[in-house]
Structures are given as C-alpha cells and as structure tokens.
C-alpha cells in the first residue's frame, strides 16, 4: 500500500514520523504517541494508545517503525471518513473556534509539535493556503491544502 505514495509524500511522512519519534530511535512507543497527542489537545488513555499502536504494529513488537507508519499513512489517505478527520484537525488548529486559523494559532500548534518555525515560515504557510487573501485560513482553504497533500 505504501508503494503508491510519491517521494514527496514519503519525505513529508518521514518528517512527521520524526516529530513522534522523540528519542530518534526509529520506533514510536505509546509514550511518544501520547506526548504528541496531548500536545494537540487530545487526552488518550493508555489503553487507547496501545490500541492505536497495535492497529499498525505489523511485527507485533509493541512499537511503530517507519514502514509501519508509512502503511498507516497510506491507509489514512484512502480513508473515506476523512471529512470528519479534517473537521477534527481544523478544530485542533482553530483554538478560539472562530472558524479561522490565524498565524498565531498555526504557530502555537506547530510549536507544540516541536516545530520551531520563524514568523516568515508561518506567514508563508498561511499565504500558501489563504485563497481569499484575508490573512487567515478558513475551513474550505484548510480542506484544499490537506487534500492537495
């Protein structure tokens, strides 16, 4: 399934994987998964984290390695219930729930994920998605960007 991904997608997923793989050992543990999810405002139980890992842990060693992560991402991209996932993701970014993602909100989430971005980089991300030029990202613009990935 992962063989249907482009080189660009694989390199983006490698970057995402390294955000989760806090100690850089090539495996995502339940602890690391929990850290990232909590930084995004989620509060999964230990059992839920274990279930998430087990879902993709092909070799049964209790962690997710990069090939397993790629398969998960490839499956997720095929998912038909992505509409709900997109709404959920938008809500994570839209801290004040006003229907828009501001530069400050984008910076906040990216910082929580361990991505230190300059103001220019954040502004560039906003500009790329900001079709109507109002300086923030509405849901339609967010969906366009996410679907283009």
From Swiss-Prot:
GO terms for molecular function: calcium ion binding. One of its GO terms (cellular component) is myosin II complex. It comes from the Eukaryota. Ca(2+) 4 binds at residues 130, 132, 134, 136, 141. Keywords: Acetylation, Calcium, Metal-binding, Methylation, Repeat. CDD domains: EFh. Ca(2+) 3 binds at residues 94, 96, 98, 105. PANTHER family: CALMODULIN, MYOSIN LIGHT CHAIN 1, 3. Belongs to the calmodulin family. This protein has four functional calcium-binding sites. This is Calmodulin. It comes from Medicago sativa (Alfalfa).
């Amino acid at each position: 399934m992962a063989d249907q991904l482009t080189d660009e997608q694989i390199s983006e997923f490698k970057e995402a994987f390294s955000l989760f793989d806090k100690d850089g050992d090539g495996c995502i543990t339940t602890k690391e998964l929990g850290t990232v999810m909590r930084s995004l405002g989620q509060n999964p139980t230990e059992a839920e984290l274990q279930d998430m890992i087990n879902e993709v842990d092909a070799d049964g060693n209790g962690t997710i390695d990069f090939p397993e992560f790629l398969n998960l991402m490839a499956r997720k991209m095929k998912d038909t219930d992505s509409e709900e996932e997109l709404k959920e993701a938008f809500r994570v970014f839209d801290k004040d729930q006003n229907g828009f993602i501001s530069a400050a909100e984008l910076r906040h989430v990216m910082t929580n994920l361990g991505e230190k971005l300059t103001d220019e980089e954040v502004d560039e991300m906003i500009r790329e998605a900001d079709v109507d030029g109002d300086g923030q990202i509405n849901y339609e613009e967010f969906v366009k960007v996410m679907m283009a990935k």
